[in-house]
Amino acid sequence: MAKFTNCLVLSLLLAAFVGAFGAEFSEADKATLVNDIAENIQKEILGEVKTSETVLTMFLKEMQLKGLPVCGETCFGGTCNTPGCSCTWPICTRDSLPMRAGGKTSETTLHMFLKEMQLKGLPVCGETCFGGTCNTPGCSCTWPICTRDSLPMSAGGKTSETTLHMFLKEMQLKGLPVCGETCFGGTCNTPGCSCTWPICTRDSLPLVAA
């Protein structure tokens, strides 16, 4: 766990460095560095057999720190409505983060999360629905994106990551704690969660196969 924490801290520092001094890098250099950060985080997450919620939390946190577009909507029509994302069927992936042979990117991590949720029989929504319809069974159009029929509406606009966060919140309502808040003080306010610095993780949850 110490190894994971050290790698995480280093990765987050690198992410902040890219954000602060990105202007001094070429686009190719920035893409390579970001890819390395994402790949290192994924290796540590899967190496420690983390939960799907933790994978999702780390994906979103790492992407948000850099201010890069978070893709993930389906692209059955062949296009992506999120700026900076391109269609790599069946989901959208970020333009600036190329895939490496033998290596996984953050998009792959998110795709694994979506696939795992689908294998559990719960529809994963998030594709855009500018045409007014959703291709995923069990999802309805809440413009501009699809949301699961059984999920409550949220105030304001929705993004793909907001939809997935609502899914986690729905799980919490069913008695499963949703962790992910920061715990710089060493404690977690959510019952059933423990501090795995710098974020809270669930005390016990079926594990994702590495």
Curated annotation (Swiss-Prot):
There is a cross-link at residues 67-95, 121-149, 175-203 (Cyclopeptide (Gly-Asp)). Transmembrane segments: none annotated. Pfam families: Cyclotide. Residues 23-66, 96-120, 150-174, 204-210 form a propeptide. The keyword Oxidoreductase does not apply. PROSITE patterns: CYCLOTIDE, CYCLOTIDE_MOEBIUS. InterPro entries: Cyclotide, Cyclotide_moebius_CS, Cyclotide_sf. Residues 1-22 form the signal peptide. Keywords: Cytolysis, Disulfide bond, Hemolysis, Knottin, Plant defense, Repeat, Signal. Disulfide bonds join 71-85, 75-87, 80-92, 125-139, 129-141, 134-146, 179-193, 183-195, 188-200. One of its GO terms (biological process) is killing of cells of another organism. It comes from the Eukaryota. Kalata-B2 is a cyclic peptide which occurs in three forms: with unmodified Trp, with Trp oxidized to form N-formylkynurenine and with Trp oxidized to form kynurenine. Oxidation is enhanced by exposure to sunlight. Belongs to the cyclotide family. Moebius subfamily. The presence of a 'disulfide through disulfide knot' structurally defines this protein as a knottin. Probably participates in a plant defense mechanism. Inhibitory effect on the growth and development of larvae from Helicoverpa punctigera. Has hemolytic activity. This is Kalata-B2. It comes from Oldenlandia affinis. The lineage of its organism: Eukaryota, Viridiplantae, Streptophyta, Embryophyta, Tracheophyta.
